[in-house]
């Protein structure tokens, strides 16, 4: 794999730099409008997710769902931070020195790390809510207390492993034939994991969830929570999923798909920035929108009527991980 493809932004910057050096006196090429939009949206999304993370960590009691949302916000924050710095770097058009080059690579890898984690977490959210509807007794009485935290830790570890494989085999590889074959193997593995495991799980569990909710009137009590889940997944599939497809194609067909890189980054930025807006508008009361405290709005959006319960020694049941 040609090392000039270590990051798509680095590739574009190198091409722009060489083009200017070849034509003396040429003016600085205009920054694509897409990068201006990214540099406008990503700080807003970063602040939104930061505020959301602060409320989830310090102002609200946790339930199984908010544990996942907390980790999803961390993944979105890391993604938005990296994409903002990459866009600023592209706009300033620094020379690609060795140290600067690897800084860009580090940011790009962290960006992929946040993206992969977001996909895995959304799948876990969808699957767990589906299980809570299919097996309500297990969910309320027998679900392990720290299952959400344990699943999140496993998914972060899986994301780290997948991202490291992608970096070592595809981004930081040389031009040797064995490196190219190793990269193809990693691409196939990631494609199977993303499009034949996690995405189908997300779609199937979401479909089952919608069907079960429509058939059960009791689900209306926590309908806002299900709306949050469904809208978040739909936004992810529309805006974020194309980026993974393009990134896998870049490694082999950069010349054909490289021009779509900026659009895929913009879509991914929109996805990560949209989540806090989804939580706010779904949790807001139509009659009191913009007049309620953020804590009240988030509590309503994340309220879980099917709170897990735990058996005590005296035979009584008590609720755990309730939301204020």
From Swiss-Prot:
One of the protein's GO biological processes: angiotensin-mediated vasodilation involved in regulation of systemic arterial blood pressure
Cytoplasmic topology ranges: 61-64, 128-148, 206-223, 284-324
Membrane topology classification: Multi-pass membrane protein
GO MF annotation: an example: G protein-coupled peptide receptor activity
Keyword Nucleus: no
Protein origin, superkingdom: Eukaryota
Protein's cellular compartments: Cell membrane
GO cellular component, one term: plasma membrane
Residues carrying a glycan: 5, 16, 21
Keyword Membrane found: yes
Pfam families registered for this protein in UniProt: 7tm_1
Cited CDD domains: 7tmA_MrgprH
Segments passing through the bilayer: 36-60, 65-86, 104-127, 149-171, 185-205, 224-244, 263-283
Keywords (A to Z) from UniProt: Cell membrane, G-protein coupled receptor, Glycoprotein, Membrane, Proto-oncogene, Receptor, Transducer, Transmembrane, Transmembrane helix
Membrane topology, Extracellular segments: 1-35, 87-103, 172-184, 245-262
Reported function: Acts specifically as a functional antagonist of AGTR1 (angiotensin-2 type 1 receptor), although it up-regulates AGTR1 receptor levels. Positive regulation of AGTR1 levels occurs through activation of the G-proteins GNA11 and GNAQ, and stimulation of the protein kinase C signaling cascade. The antagonist effect on AGTR1 function is probably due to AGTR1 being physically altered by MAS1. Receptor for angiotensin 1-7.
Sequence similarity: Belongs to the G-protein coupled receptor 1 family.
Assembly with partners or alone: Interacts with AGTR1. Interacts with FLNA (via filamin repeat 21); increases PKA-mediated phosphorylation of FLNA.
Protein known as: Proto-oncogene Mas
Lineage: Eukaryota, Metazoa, Chordata, Craniata, Vertebrata
Gene: Mas1
């Amino acid at each position: 794999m040609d090392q000039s493809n270590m990051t798509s932004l680095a590739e574009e910057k190198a091409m722009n730099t060489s083009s200017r050096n070849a034509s003396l006196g040429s003016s600085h090429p205009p920054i694509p409008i897409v990068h201006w939009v990214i540099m406008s949206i990503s700080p807003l999304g970063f602040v939104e997710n930061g505020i959301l993370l602060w409320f989830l960590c310090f102002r609200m009691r946790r339930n199984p769902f908010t544990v996942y949302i907390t980790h999803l916000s961390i993944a979105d924050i890391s993604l938005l931070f990296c994409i903002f710095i990459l866009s600023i770097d592209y706009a300033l058009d620094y020379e690609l020195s060795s140290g600067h080059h690897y800084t860009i690579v580090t940011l790009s890898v962290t960006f992929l790390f946040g993206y992969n984690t977001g996909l895995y977490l959304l799948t876990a959210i969808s699957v767990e809510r589906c299980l809570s509807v299919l097996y309500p007794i297990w969910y309320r009485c027998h679900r392990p207390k720290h299952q959400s935290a344990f699943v999140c830790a496993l998914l972060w570890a899986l994301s780290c492993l997948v991202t490291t494989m992608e970096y070592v085999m595809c981004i930081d590889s040389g031009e040797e034939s064995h490196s190219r074959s190793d990269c193809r193997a990693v691409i196939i593995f990631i494609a199977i994991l993303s499009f034949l495991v996690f995405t189908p799980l997300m779609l199937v569990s979401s479909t089952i969830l919608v069907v079960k909710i429509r058939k059960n009137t009791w689900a209306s009590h926590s309908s806002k929570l299900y709306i949050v889940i469904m809208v978040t997944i739909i936004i992810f599939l529309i805006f974020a999923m194309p980026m993974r497809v393009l990134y896998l194609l870049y490694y082999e067909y950069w010349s054909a798909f490289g021009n779509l890189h900026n659009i895929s980054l913009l879509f991914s930025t929109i996805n990560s920035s949209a989540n806090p807006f989804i939580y706010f508008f779904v949790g807001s009361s139509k009659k009191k929108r913009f007049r309620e405290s953020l804590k009240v709005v988030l509590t309503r959006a994340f309220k879980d009527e099917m709170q897990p319960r735990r058996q005590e020694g005296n035979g009584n049941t008590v609720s755990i991980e309730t939301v204020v």
